[in-house]
Amino acid sequence: LMPDEYEYKDKIVGNYGPYIQSERIEIYHAYIKRLIEIGRAYPCFCKKETLEELRKNQEEKKMRTGYYGRFAKCRSISIEEAITRIKNGESYVIRFKSEGDFNNKIIFEDLSKGKLSLSENDIDDVIMKSDTMLPTYHFAHVVDDHLMHTTHVVRGEEWLPSVTKHIEMFRALGLKPVSYTHLRAHETSLHL
């Protein structure tokens, strides 16, 4: 099986490059800017220790763990404060502001598993851009698959819980979600 789009060594094949994420940063930033403008993304300045403490407190109280709702402290930071903190060199990531409700379902057709119904994502304002300026898999998947006209994604079933995050991001950007197929790896520890 030969891909119809790729970059390998000195050979570039396809119409939708560049194919290396670090060469697509301006593209990702344009989409992030749009999400910030419509109130669906925000900078988060929480340190690793703060997030670990949050998780520990949620576990102790037998709550669902995650950076969401009232626990997402940076959701309410004003644009002015965020700009000041960024200009002062404070480290940050960009998070997607999920509007999911656990009681609502996202229904979609998985091409190998059939019609599936999963609760909307309401416990994770997923990181879209790391503090290194590169996008995370979740965000790159949505942007790249749209721009590269990907219609079908085949991946391991360990990614099934992420479908709700991805579909919500596609919809927030006004993009058509791809079709998914989630396959179980054989009895090995290989990941698809």
Whereabouts are the PLM-identified features?
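A glycine-rich helix N-cap at a beta->alpha junction
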Residues: 1-12
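A conserved beta-strand/loop capping segment in the N-terminal third of enzymes
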Residues: 10-13, 27-28, 32
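Short amphipathic alpha-helical segments at helix-loop
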Residues: 13-16, 151
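Short coil/turn segments at secondary-structure boundaries
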Residues: 15-26, 38
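Active-site cores that bind ATP or allylic diphosphates and position pyrophosphate for catalysis
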Residues: 21, 34-180, 184, 189
